[in-house]
Amino acid sequence: MEELQGYLKIDRSRERDFLYPLLFQEYIYALAHDHGLNKSILYEPMENLGYDKKYSLIIVKRLITRMYQQKHLIIFTNDSNPNFFFGHNKNLDYQMISEGVAVIVELPFSLRLVSSPESKEIDKSMTTLRSIHSIFPFLEDKLLHLNHVLDILIPYPIHLELLVQTLRSWIQDAPFLHLLRFFLYKYHNWNSLITQKTKMILFFSKENQRFFLFLYNFHVYESESIFVFLRKQSYHLRSTSSRAFLDRTHFYRKIEHFLVDFRNDFHTILWLFKDPFIQYFRFQGKSILSSKGTPLLMKKWKYYLVNLWECHFYFWSQPDRIHINQLSNHFIDFLGYLSSVRPTPSAVRSQMLEKSFIIDIVIKKFDTIVPIIPLIGSLAKAKFCNFSGHPISKPAWADSSDSDIIDRFGRICRNLSHYYSGSSKKKSLYRIKYILRLSCARTLARKHKSTVRSFLKRLGSEFLEEFLMEEEQVLSFILPRISYFSKRLYKERIWYFDIIRINDLTNLS
């Protein structure tokens, strides 16, 4: 953010944000490349031209010069069905502009959040909050005292024009808003895509992820704004969002702050739902609202959320996108884990003088398990096994060297072990490892035109053990008495604070 401020030199005292002139500044496209979420399309032309993967100002200048030439930017205004052509390499030019627009449109939000008094305090606690695993200890501490959950799918806007109208409250630059409309209508088929019940994020264009991720995150930001009153009612709410919005998948910032102004009549209505034990958490398009309240209160929440989203935000939220469940007999599908709160009965012996008593008590336990069926489906989509879980070879990797094949399978196995180290039961994880191990063996046997049995008999099975036991070897350096710990590894849960993105195989499920 310091780099953005240094480049742009924006006067924060101005009440209005005029962003359109920034489109003609070359450094904006440099920032779009340097601060991109994913590998930029600029990497490919630089490789073809013999450059390395660093930013090249010469390439940016050439692209901007070509975009300024009329013969490469033709707009047919008299045609009843206008089409836009961006020269011979329209995809590259179009992505350059869209990435620049994405950087510019984030500025009003980022600068306001940086200028907030809470930002410095939040930066101090960013180290552990970056990890996805950091949310599970929080859930274990809070959900044990709650009764019901609302499984909510984030609603979608009726029309993408509503996103532009909502942005008008943040950006008062009319030419820039017209440019946003241009990009939205370029993807006119979005209105049919976002009405699907599948994950909205899957429809993002691979070439313009930053632009559409911003729109999606702004949409989620608005839909979550109804929970701002809870921070004023109870300190128990720990809802988080990111500095430049949360769902960048590689999310790198989280803050505990909402910057949304509410109408006075909202407070009167929302006060009826005062609940000091309510908890809210979200990832991508799915959110969970848990409470200690009665089923009647949860039904009120469901009715109120649907009506508020539809009537005040014009978001299309069907009632079947919100489900009421009881925590004691429900699994929460969140971040690739199946989490649950299970009552565990136990007996306690109490002795007073010469008499003893046995007291039966019930203790709630927070469990997290690996969803085996969705993971097998993901492995099947990636061609590691069939949908029944039977391992198959990976023909696409058969041309690689033996060490490269083993390294690829080992990396997948280690990443899965690392991500699902917080599972209460490791049996499902061991089955996934078994599938990957046999798939690796079948791939090597296919390469050497041999059977799996004869191949393992000739080379021995030890060469496949190293990447399957990586997690246990790491733990031996961290925890003492590893021989004792290895016996309990099946039941122990370990959360890591260096995981900043969900596992790729989990995203496929």
UniProtKB/Swiss-Prot annotation:
Transmembrane segments: none annotated. InterPro entries: Domain_X (IPR024937), Maturase_MatK (IPR002866), Maturase_MatK_N (IPR024942). Keywords: Chloroplast, mRNA processing, Plastid, RNA-binding, tRNA processing. GO terms for cellular component: chloroplast. Its main location: plastid. The keyword Transferase does not apply. It is found in: Plastid, Chloroplast. One of its GO terms (molecular function) is RNA binding. Pfam families: Intron_maturas2, MatK_N. One of its GO terms (biological process) is mRNA processing. PANTHER family: MATURASE K. Usually encoded in the trnK tRNA gene intron. Probably assists in splicing its own and other chloroplast group II introns. Belongs to the intron maturase 2 family. MatK subfamily. This is Maturase K. It comes from Clematis terniflora.
